[in-house]
Amino acid sequence: MIEITAEIRALIDKAAAGVELAGDEYIDSADGLIHCKKCGGQRQTVVPCFGKLGYFMPRCICQCQQEAEEQRKAAEERQRRMERIKRRKTQGLQDRYLYDYTFANDNGQNPLMDKARAYVENWKEAYKNNTGLLLFGDVGTGKSFFAGCIANALLDQDVPVLMTNFPTILNRLTGMFSEDRSEFIASFDEYDLLIIDDLGVERSTEYAMEQMFFVIDSRYRSRRPMIITTNLKLSELKNPPDLAHARIYDRILERCAPILFDGKNFREENAGATRQAAKDIVSSKHD
């Protein structure tokens, strides 16, 4: 801050004669400069003219203006982040029902959900160490819900996640040229976490097995984590029927820690509740 000499003060007073003040500004009698009524900070300063004698008095921002600008930028960043998360969810959760697979909707009946929460809490370490999960067990035991909760929680943290399945992938690949297929499979590497739901439901044709291998191998080489859900038994994964399956399963077992889902069939329980609700509706009497 330049010392306000008598010479400089005369220049300040001369400049102040024609200045227009905002409603929240005043000219301080001590230094003759424009100040903020709210915080008392300077909104004008004194700067020497470079290369020649003299001074000029440019505007500057006070503390409350600085805080307001920081709040504006923070609000803009929050808005951009929300829009980015929305786009990520649209891209990463291609089936609308997956939006409901959240920890908030967990009924607390599956003790394995604590592992899903732990995975999210330790995501940075899991990503760094390329730690994936293999969720295996009977139909309806909560594997997809478990994976979906992880997907939604990480997406809410602005982490790129894709949850899909091989029938969808194979359908997209159908009709593509070889170069386009390679580019499509490589696009999965844009996601920090890739979730393949229901491994084993796809047809085991030579073409399908080849494309499945390309997807898993690409992920394996990218050293990014993946979560696989399947109704297959662990013994089936460890003892594949042929080389084509072995190449896929070996890579999954190396990168994904197995978690057994052997509880009750939640899907059947939900179906029972749905049937009862439908029965109540159709049998209700109207006045």
Question: Language-model features: where?
Answer:
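Short glycine-rich substrate-engagement loop in P-loop NTPases that contacts/grips substrate
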Residues: P111-V120, K128, A151-Y191, R203-E210
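Walker A/P-loop nucleotide-binding motif
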Residues: Y127-A147
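Pre-Walker A (pre-P-loop) alpha-helix and adjacent loop at the N terminus of AAA/AAA+ ATPase modules
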Residues: Q91-L133
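Loop/turn-to-beta-strand initiation segments
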Residues: V159-P160, E190-L193, S222-I228
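Hydrophobic/aromatic beta-strand patches that form the interior of the parallel beta-sheet core
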Residues: L133, L162, I195, I227, ...
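Walker B catalytic acidic pair
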Residues: D198-L199
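A short, basic N-terminal segment
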Residues: M1-N107, E269-D287
